[in-house]
């Protein structure tokens, strides 16, 4: 079964699960970079396409809002991670006390973080995982399930977003992390500041972020959702995992053998050879 058939299967199953809920609230105003906006946009498109009615509640109001007959729907996130867990697990705990049910849409989880385990262990919390490693780590905690990341439900081919004529000779778009998610510094390297564009931090809206990717033929990145967008926009993707197997695990589950002609995993030495990264002493 190819990616598109599997996506439809997961989309229909997820919508069926959500439709069983009444008085649905969607969590909004979540902290994150522009890449996270792709998840939120895909989530809204999923709900609208399924004719699911929902109200919105900002993340800052969850702790002080009692909706004992309502369900809170939390968009997928990477904020259950060792590096970023300062707000979302606490939000889940507060919501589990104030809402009848809490559904966490497909996310990645790090169960080495105690507050993550505590939040997912609440009896009325239903977490979805977006890749197999996370699912296997949480399935013993609660009502866990596996599903495609909602970013994959985003429609990149809406009217007005058709591809422009792309210059085949244009240099690849280099998008290497410049935040705490990058381990380049611990290995003595940094992104080449002359050519690196960490668009998840530097663009101001999702449309601009997508346009940056749309207007090239090749993307080199260690950012997950930059990679997802590149693949679904038909670009050549060259990626490296920022830590662990973050992108590799996700791509293996989501894309399987689909798009294998578009996706290439690279190494630090390859990035060095192409001057995409520099030793820190040369970049000081």
Located regions from the model:
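Active-site anion-handling motifs in enzyme catalytic cores
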Residues: 1-284
């Amino acid at each position: 079964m190819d990616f598109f058939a599997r996506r439809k299967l997961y989309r229909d199953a997820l919508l069926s699960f959500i439709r069983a809920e009444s008085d649905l609230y969607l969590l909004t105003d979540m902290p994150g970079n522009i890449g996270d906006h792709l998840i939120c946009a895909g989530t809204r498109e999923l709900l609208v396409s399924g004719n699911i009615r929902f109200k919105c509640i900002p993340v800052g109001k969850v702790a002080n809002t009692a909706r004992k007959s309502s369900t809170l729907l939390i968009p997928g996130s990477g904020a259950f991670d060792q590096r970023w867990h300062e707000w979302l697990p606490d939000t889940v705990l507060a919501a589990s006390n104030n809402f009848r049910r809490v559904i966490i849409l497909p996310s990645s989880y790090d169960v080495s973080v105690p507050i993550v385990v505590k939040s997912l262990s609440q009896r009325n919390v239903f977490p979805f995982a977006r890749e197999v490693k996370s699912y296997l780590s949480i399935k013993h905690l609660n009502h866990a399930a596996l599903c495609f990341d909602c970013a994959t439900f985003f429609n990149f081919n809406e009217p007005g977003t058709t591809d422009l004529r792309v210059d085949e000779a244009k240099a690849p778009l280099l998008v290497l992390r410049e935040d705490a998610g990058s381990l380049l510094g611990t290995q003595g390297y940094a992104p080449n500041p002359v050519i690196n564009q960490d668009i998840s931090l530097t663009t101001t809206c999702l449309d601009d972020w997508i346009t940056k990717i749309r207007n090239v033929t090749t993307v080199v990145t260690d950012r997950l959702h930059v990679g997802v967008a590149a693949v679904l926009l038909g670009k050549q993707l060259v990626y490296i995992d920022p830590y662990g197997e973050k992108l590799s695990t996700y791509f293996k589950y989501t894309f399987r053998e689909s798009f294998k002609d578009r996706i290439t995993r690279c190494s630090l030495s390859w990035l060095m050879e192409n001057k995409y990264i520099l030793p820190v002493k040369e970049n000081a």
